[in-house]
């Protein structure tokens, strides 16, 4: 086909040009004969019939399983942080994203900044379906979803996973949970 006729065909919108077609690759007679000879041999036929097509261990194929990044069967890591300002909180979020448990000791922070930090990390923990727990006064535990957190404190009925209640629980009577240094212990649920 000449160059001019090709250009005319392209401009006219002809999708199929004379020389352009898809060739299907068919097996040659020699290949078909080899396959038939293989099947006719009783030893090969039994081996083929008894083979498991899903047995990946005996096949000479390489495994195509790819591990999840950040997930390992080795020991888990715990990151202990004692931030002095809110600017250090993205490091805690990054540790949670890397599936590390984070313990925050907020005694060195200003009370307003500490409350903001807890809210920020709690939001990040919620976003990754993680768990959060108050460990002590101004000390909090944040864990990714791959970590089970249980509590064996005497005020709970039985050890269980971390509660994920959304509403704050305040009591006017005896306090059973530790209060943060900046908290007001005389809060009511409706004030």
From Swiss-Prot:
GO cellular component, one term: cytoplasm
GO biological process: division septum assembly; FtsZ-dependent cytokinesis
Biased composition (Low complexity): 151-164
Keywords: Cell cycle, Cell division, Cytoplasm, Septation
Location in the cell: Cytoplasm
Similarity annotation: Belongs to the SepF family.
Subunit structure: Homodimer. Interacts with FtsZ.
Name by which UniProt lists this protein: Cell division protein SepF
Species name: Prochlorococcus marinus (strain MIT 9301)
Lineage: Bacteria, Bacillati, Cyanobacteriota, Cyanophyceae, Synechococcales
